[in-house]
Amino acid sequence: MILQEQELKWSLEKGKSNMTIKGITFIGGGSFGTALGIMLAKKGYNINIWDRKPHVIADINEKKENIKYLPNVVIPSNVKAYKGMKEALVGIKYVVISVPSHAIREICRNMKDYLKEDAIIISVAKGIEEHSGKRLSQIIKEELPKNPVVILSGPSHAEEVAQDIPTTVVVTSEDVKASLEVQNLFSTNKFRVYTNDDIIGVEIGGAVKNIIALAAGISDGIGYGDNTKAALMTRGINEIIRIGEKLGGQRETFWGLTGMGDMIVTCTSMHSRNRRAGLLIGKGLSMEEAIEEVGMVVEGIKACKAFYELKEKLKVSMPITDALYRVLFQGEDAKYCVYELMTRDKKDE
């Protein structure tokens, strides 16, 4: 009872201080964007959610629930969904992009005419651009050069954030002031936010871990055990480190929340769509069938293709990524790929 009273007092105090902010807009009404919007609405902010899908907009506004992406979670009254991007963005200082990574560039181009010049762009997407290999912050900065860009990443499944289960994430930016603003904006007594100055490491860790989670799911689907998953995760973090350092990231970042932490939760959680897709593929479904069954974007599939191209170009050893690419895009048998991984040349750890 005392804890509930403290939380209510804390929420009311935060709500008073938040009256000066006109609102926060989320571009994309998926599960994670909705969960973060609910969390910030509880702090007293007015939340706008823009989405293309009429049924998502209707459900949020009329039923106060995102039935498609975050069912059985009540959405507060100070959350409103919009079909028009201009209406959702005008006068807003904080804009959270929560769309699939492949849509980032198009979304930024569509937003450009409606943004305040000092609006801070916060991306919670994870991935890199196919063919160019550019990180999402680079894409956003190319399209919106006047606006500060902040990346929010870490082990944070939407289903748990929406239920106020204690969660810890990281924000990073080339603009230190913007990073600190976003840290303050998102921090609650159930959602702890650290800052980190290694934007490259944070973004690469968050993108590559989805590849490892897909592989871990396939292992589970085949019927392999904890030994196999432990090996995949441990060797997987080494792949993250190798490609991450090659791209300019710092090794210590990959052992933190946005590397090891995010990989652990994505490889093991029942909420992980990447692990779930891998599980289905391991049980015999095709990649297309697995995506349809999951019903949401599986970032690890696009990441696998993009990082396969990038590691070939940079000549970085990523054997798990290699094996997954052959399973997904060349039709090789997953068990045979595991056999190949296990019988590679002997070497020191």
Swiss-Prot record:
Binding site residues for NADPH: 31-32, 52-53, 126, 158, 273, 297, 299
UniProt-annotated binding residues for sn-glycerol 3-phosphate: 126, 154, 156, 209, 262, 272-274
Pfam families: NAD_Gly3P_dh_C, NAD_Gly3P_dh_N
Recorded metabolic or biological pathway in which this protein acts: Membrane lipid metabolism; glycerophospholipid metabolism
Keyword Transport: no
GO annotation (BP), single: glycerol-3-phosphate catabolic process
Catalytic activity: sn-glycerol 3-phosphate + NAD(+) = dihydroxyacetone phosphate + NADH + H(+); sn-glycerol 3-phosphate + NADP(+) = dihydroxyacetone phosphate + NADPH + H(+)
Sequence similarity: Belongs to the NAD-dependent glycerol-3-phosphate dehydrogenase family.
PANTHER family registered for this protein in UniProt: GLYCEROL-3-PHOSPHATE DEHYDROGENASE, GLYCEROL-3-PHOSPHATE DEHYDROGENASE [NAD(+)] 2, CHLOROPLASTIC
Function: Catalyzes the reduction of the glycolytic intermediate dihydroxyacetone phosphate (DHAP) to sn-glycerol 3-phosphate (G3P), the key precursor for phospholipid synthesis.
The protein's name: Glycerol-3-phosphate dehydrogenase [NAD(P)+]
Organismal lineage: Bacteria, Bacillati, Bacillota, Clostridia, Eubacteriales
Gene: gpsA
